[in-house]
């Protein structure tokens, strides 16, 4: 909400990670893994839940409560949230350039407010982070874990989601908004 009122905060936060004409933390530590490997891991985790559901369907015995209703809900929320709304609509049609693409950070595109539909990006744009959306979607999966693991699963998803958001900002791929 603060960023919508003061879009300059987006530039200030991104500038914190921009030194010597580059986003200097882009290849630091586990940040490249977050960009390249993490989505595949979460797809694998979702596939594992699908296999658990399939096993339960064949055996007529549900493991961890993962039944057809649960699978429809989790799959539907993935299709609706991260895939359709975030990647299919916002990233495709919002047109907001990524930080590394804008003039302020050595690119040739104009900075635009997060609340303004723009023409500065044609495809795979900055607003919103698909990586972070997929990770936070996995909260639905964490809620399916047995009670003794659920708190740890939810905590892990929240920490990983925040870390991924920070990493994507540090890489110059997304603004804080």
What are these regions (language model features)?
Residues 5-6, 51-63, 142-149:
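Structural signal for the C-terminal ends of transmembrane alpha-helices
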Residues 2-4, 79-85, 159-169:
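Aromatic-anchored segments of alpha-helical transmembrane domains
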Residues 1-50, 88-99, 103-110:
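N-terminal transmembrane-helix/juxtamembrane module of multi-pass inner/ER membrane proteins
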Residues 12, 37-44, 70-73, 151-159:
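Alpha-helical transmembrane segments of integral membrane proteins
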Residues 38-53, 131-145:
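Hydrophobic alpha-helical transmembrane segments
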Residues 26-37, 62-66, 122, 145-152:
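Juxtamembrane loop-transmembrane helix junctions in multi-pass integral membrane proteins
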Residues 55-93, 154-156:
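Interfacial segments of alpha-helical transmembrane regions
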Residues 112-177:
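Membrane-embedded catalytic cores of phosphoryl/pyrophosphoryl-handling enzymes
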